[in-house]
């Protein structure tokens, strides 16, 4: 392991027009203008956004596999893997449940659907039929069985994050178990990390094009005008998500010695990319690299980030309970405390079953309402038109939640370089030396 003898000279910052976050901002603005004034042309820009997301998905599996395998194989005690995973899952379960409760509380306070007096029988259910059909496949057993791939190769071919995670953990444990015999393979995989992340950097140069196409399509197809009728619901959701991040996650960050706002600033390029593409997956490889650069252990990053993308969906959870109670209020459906507790419990399970599913938020909502028959599934037609505009906020909240979780779990494990984190969050990335991985078991575990 190379340890630098002196800090490198600070690199000259790039001009603003060459920085990714600025390019993405310009692309989003131009895409919105095109979609608004030339909606038919804007709709035709959809392939640009789809192509970029597919490019990123192409590299996600290798990034996850290499990060997890090299991280686990470098651990001297395999029980550390189980400890990190257990702490991560405990964090995910607590804050995912808290997000569901927050969405429910806000729905009661704001009452976004009150006074609409909608008759569910008069709603057009054909538009939501396909989502309801997909929701029938979301069962806990089916979700658990889907984690196991049919072959070692199929997980990479299908791009299933959980399956790649499963294979990587097993292979990393096996590689660590064989000791010195596995060293050549570990060295090869560690050498492979550099070109793979270089490829990520190359692909990210296309981010402005992808963001332009995705936002032009959204505005062109759905129009800003579709927000007016349900602006109270959309506004309530955005405000709730912001308060969840600023207050709840903000307190967690403060207790761990850093600011959630500085973390968001550090990840501004990734957040803008998520905003433009409405997909948190589009920034997954870059998030993993940046969290490691900010002082989080490679092994913790490799376990927490991919797992969090399936189990730590704070934004989706807020949306589910808020939208469900909005539908109940709009259709004058009375829900007892027992009904609402049942809704909460079902949402806890169904939100885990939609990992990696396109349109996961809407599909999990359909799955939840199907199990809690008191809320009419037909009421989903009310929010179908504005769901796309809430998708960006869901993705942004999910993304920030996973970034916070990575730092918190790293700190719990004593696997966080706080000096690197402070430099990164203060915007002094040019002063950062090459990352030196902190192996969790080398330090006393905390928490």
Swiss-Prot record:
Coiled coil: none annotated. It is a multi-pass membrane protein. One of its GO terms (cellular component) is plasma membrane. Keywords: Cell inner membrane, Cell membrane, Membrane, Symport, Transmembrane, Transmembrane helix, Transport. It comes from the Bacteria. One of its GO terms (molecular function) is fumarate transmembrane transporter activity. The chain crosses the membrane at residues 22-42, 52-72, 90-110, 159-179, 199-219, 232-252, 325-347, 366-386. One of its GO terms (biological process) is L-aspartate transmembrane transport. Its main location: membrane. Belongs to the dicarboxylate/amino acid:cation symporter (DAACS) (TC 2.A.23) family. This is C4-dicarboxylate transport protein. It comes from Stenotrophomonas maltophilia (strain R551-3).
């Amino acid at each position: 392991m190379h340890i630098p003898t002196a800090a490198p000279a600070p690199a000259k910052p790039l001009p603003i027009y060459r920085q990714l976050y600025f390019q993405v901002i310009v692309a989003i603005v131009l895409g919105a203008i095109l979609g608004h004034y030339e909606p038919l042309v804007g709709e035709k820009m959809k392939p640009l956004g789809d192509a970029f997301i597919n490019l990123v998905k192409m590299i996600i599996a290798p990034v996850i596999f290499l990060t997890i395998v090299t991280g686990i194989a470098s651990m001297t005690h395999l029980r550390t893997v189980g400890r990190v995973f257990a702490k991560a899952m405990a964090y995910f379960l607590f804050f995912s449940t808290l997000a569901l409760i927050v969405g429910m509380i806000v729905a009661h306070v704001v009452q976004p659907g009150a006074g609409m007096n909608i008759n569910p029988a008069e709603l057009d259910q054909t538009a939501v039929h396909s989502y309801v059909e997909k929701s029938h496949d979301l069962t806990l057993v089916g979700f658990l069985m889907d984690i196991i791939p049919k072959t070692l190769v199929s997980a990479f071919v299908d791009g299933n994050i959980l399956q790649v995670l499963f294979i990587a953990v097993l292979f990393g444990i096996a590689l660590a178990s064989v000791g010195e015999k596995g060293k050549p393979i570990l060295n090869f995989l560690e050498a492979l990390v550099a070109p793979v992340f270089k490829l990520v950097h190359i692909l990210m140069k296309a981010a402005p094009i992808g963001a332009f196409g995705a936002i032009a399509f959204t505005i062109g197809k759905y129009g800003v005008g579709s927000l007016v009728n349900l602006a109270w619901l959309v506004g309530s959701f955005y405000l709730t998500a912001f308060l969840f991040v600023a207050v709840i996650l903000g307190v967690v960050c403060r207790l761990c010695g850093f600011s959630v706002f500085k973390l968001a600033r550090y990840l501004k390029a990734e957040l803008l990319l998520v905003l433009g593409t409405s997909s948190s997956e589009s920034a997954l490889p870059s998030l993993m690299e940046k969290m490691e650069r900010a002082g989080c252990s490679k092994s913790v990053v490799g376990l927490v980030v991919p797992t969090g993308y399936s189990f730590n969906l704070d934004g989706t959870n807020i949306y589910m309970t808020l939208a469900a109670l909005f539908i109940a209020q709009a259709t004058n459906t009375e829900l007892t405390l027992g009904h609402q507790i049942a809704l909460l419990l079902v949402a806890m399970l169904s939100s885990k079953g939609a990992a990696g599913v396109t349109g996961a938020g809407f599909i999990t909502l359909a799955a939840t309402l199907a199990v809690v028959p008191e809320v009419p599934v037909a009421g989903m037609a009310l929010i179908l038109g504005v769901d796309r505009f809430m998708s960006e906020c869901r993705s942004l909240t999910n993304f920030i939640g996973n970034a916070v979780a990575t730092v918190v779990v790293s700190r719990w494990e004593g696997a966080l370089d706080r000096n690197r984190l402070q430099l990164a969050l203060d915007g002094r990335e040019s002063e950062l030396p090459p990352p030196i991985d902190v192996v969790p078991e080398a330090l006393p575990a905390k928490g």
